[in-house]
Amino acid sequence: MSNMQQKTDVILIGAGIMSATLGSLLKELAPEWEIKVFEKLASAGEESSNEWNNAGTGHSALCELNYTSEKSDGSIDISKAVKVNEQFQLSRQFWAYLVKSKLIRNPQDFIMPLPHMSLVQGEKNVQFLKNRFEALSKNPLFQGMEFSDSPETLKKWLPLIMEGRTSNEPMAATKIDSGTDVNFGALTRMLFDYLKTKNVELNYKHSVENIKRTKNGLWEVKVHDMNSGKIEHHTAKFVFIGGGGGSLPLLQKTGIPESKHIGGFPVSGLFMVCKNQKVVEQHHAKVYGKAKVGAPPMSVPHLDTRYIDNKKALLFGPFAGFSPKFLKTGSNLDLIGSVKPNNVLTMLAAGVKEMGLTKYLIQQVMLSHEKRMEELREFIPNAKSEDWDIVVAGQRVQVIKDTDAGGKGTLQFGTEVVSAADGSIAALLGASPGASTAVHVMLEVLEKCFPSRMVEWEGKIKEMIPSYGISLTENPRLFQDLHTSTGRTLGLNEKETVHN
């Protein structure tokens, strides 16, 4: 059963944080535009954006060591860390604007202040962390960071981690109190509640089956209404594909030249969750370690305080798993179905190149509960098996493409916008830092897809996001003012004490 074509201005595919952010920006910039959202699941924020399906870190490179690499002369390259931090500041500013404008309420339901810490062991790693601390401390975005290699200080900062430690190996940590824990699931649901009040049409249990170009230049989206079983056809001038791991297969259906020679490799994440509330209360930070030599960036171990359903939780991970599904709720045929004549060589080249990743995934899949406990005990020496359960988090599809620097079949560890030359359709691919940089990434979509509107929109964008187009690193006074004002609006300025 098929019905007539239904026209609209904008179609957003996927009801996650990315579509929620883009929809919110567009409703502020072009309130008269009609927007329709199609989501396969029964509600918003249930896949990658769901609070149990990601680490909930407000990624601002305060503690993630993979954003600061060591050069051959021992100096530290902080350029990536600065970039990630600048991008997170845009998210903070937009969220603060939404709260201040009363478009969303109760910021404590989606963002909480939480110290971000890095922790290392061994003389060489201690020196690396000290060098990193010194390099970052010169940058205004990282003011307030502390370094210590004193066991007494570390016991105060990290009581749970330091208790029962018998090794005399040198240890060091950095600590910064301006970190955050973000519940992206709650934020996504809030944004869609706001969009509903702006007459955005939210269609849940609607699966997008195909996307094709019409003769008059519009995009026709074929949608299966899973409630009624009917097939619908919707057309729009602009389509955004924000379906997490499901974006790649939909992008391939568009047939745009930019969709060729791109592949995807799914990796699932697993976390250990503490079920002993007494243990949970002894830790109050996100603590990131250093990835083991040869392990991919996604494997950086971290012990995180989380706030989920207004309750404090403690998670450790990630451990990697493998499933051929591109979404947690996807199909076992997703991976094989994404291999096309135009990307098969790219995929094969990646297979040869990434033997290290393949080996790592095989080792991870084979881990028993006790083996995972051994890894946890590197963080919490006294951890008891009976206190910890394993939860399967979300699927992440790492992008594989041909690059000038890496050659054919290069694995990308990041978030990437792919758009048609005329800006009529865009898709978001990739993984970390993901949700934290949603505002930056969606501004990139606007710049790529609506270049002729940017001059007209710039004033409103700067009202919502004052540092848009400005380097905060080069404007420390502006950074300080914005950090203070957004912190006040989002309830982040109250320095929380470490639970001893």
From Swiss-Prot:
Pathway: Carbohydrate metabolism; tricarboxylic acid cycle; oxaloacetate from (S)-malate (quinone route): step 1/1. Keywords: FAD, Flavoprotein, Oxidoreductase, Tricarboxylic acid cycle. The keyword Oxidoreductase applies. It catalyses: (S)-malate + a quinone = a quinol + oxaloacetate. GO terms for biological process: tricarboxylic acid cycle. Its cofactor is FAD. InterPro entries: FAD/NAD-bd_sf, MQO. Belongs to the MQO family. This is Probable malate:quinone oxidoreductase. It comes from Bacillus cereus (strain AH187). The gene is mqo.
